[in-house]
Design a protein with these regions (language model features):
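Polymerase palm active-site segment centered on the conserved acidic dipeptide of motif C
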Residues: 151-169
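Feature marks short, surface-exposed loop/turn motifs that line or immediately flank catalytic pockets
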Residues: 64-66, 105, 141, 175, ...
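Short coil/turn connectors at secondary-structure junctions
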Residues: 7-8, 28, 51-55, 94, ...
Length: 284
């Protein structure tokens, strides 16, 4: 998408590459980060043979993250992501030009500050051998109250300590934070044992999976979470999965078929996690 829509090759990372996919990965990438030394050793000869100057790096694990939800914590004990300092050789293999680290999720600059302390403590020994340091995503710099001046000071300080390093950030959600809603329509209202469910023409498991996996609680326009109001409903998805629902929400009026239900600030996940489970249509 970066290449086709923006005309720019991507900084690419995957927990594991396959020989079938790797030629296309190289075509679309300016930088490729490997999750393990074994993956680097397997595919680096292909990078050399391709000869387009792709810069290769390795993902590191500083064994520190302030992400509280285990599902989103890339540095949880036993994580499959990245290499710990004790497993890196004193001299990096020829061809490794950078370190990539991803430790954040909708995080502040102060969490980045703490993470940098751990990265420098454990990995700065190798900084003289690399050209770039990618600090990954999860930096929610567009959220109200984010201290951008503190972020600038952090990055300037890091650059002053290691002037030869190119410092890279990959904010993701920050680009789409509070920029789009998911609008659904009530197609039926059912009741079972006193529980009313408004069935929608969208699906939590297909279109909003984080609501079930986290669970992330979306804001619903014109409703309050909880069962304390007069007009209380579950919101149900239109798939066969029994757990494809969320609730309860209290509305200020009785819902009716054809009414629109608006989920606030959903664009950053509905864009990338849709699927055709049950033949459910993608959001338009």
């Amino acid at each position: 998408l970066a290449l086709e829509e923006f005309g720019s090759k991507a900084h690419t990372y995957s927990p594991a590459y396959t020989e079938q996919d790797f030629p296309e990965i190289m075509r679309c990438s300016s930088h490729i980060t490997f999750n393990s030394l074994a993956q680097f050793q397997r595919f680096y000869p292909m990078v050399l043979a391709e000869g387009s100057g792709i810069s290769c790096g390795i993902r590191i694990n500083p064994e520190y993250s302030e992400v509280e939800t285990e599902l989103y914590n890339p540095c949880a004990p036993g994580t499959r992501f990245g290499i710990t300092a004790d497993l890196l050789p004193e001299v990096l293999p020829q061809g490794i030009e950078g370190f990539h680290c991803h430790c954040h999720c909708e995080s502040s600059s102060f969490e980045l500050e703490h993470t940098l302390q751990h990265i420098e403590e454990k990995f700065s020994h190798w900084f003289s051998q690399i050209k770039w340091l990618n600090l990954g995503g999860g930096h929610l710099m567009t959220r109200k109250g984010y201290d951008t001046e503190h972020l600038i000071r952090l990055l300037q300080g890091l650059k002053s300590r290691y002037p030869h390093l190119q410092i890279i950030l990959e904010p993701g959600s920050a680009f789409t934070w509070q920029t789009g809603v998911l609008t659904s329509e009530i197609v039926d209202i059912v009741e079972s044992r006193g529980i009313k469910t408004a069935i929608l023409n969208v699906s939590f498991t297909c279109h909003m999976p984080d609501c079930l996996e986290m669970p992330y609680q979306p804001a619903v326009r014109g409703a309050e979470m909880g069962a304390n109001g007069t007009f209380v409903y579950r919101l149900g998805g239109n798939s066969c999965l029994s757990g494809d629902y969320m609730g309860f929400w209290s509305f200020d009026h009785e819902l009716r078929m054809g009414e629109r239900i608006v989920f606030e600030d959903m664009i950053h996940y509905t864009m990338v996690k849709t699927n055709m489970f049950n033949g459910i249509h993608h959001p338009s």
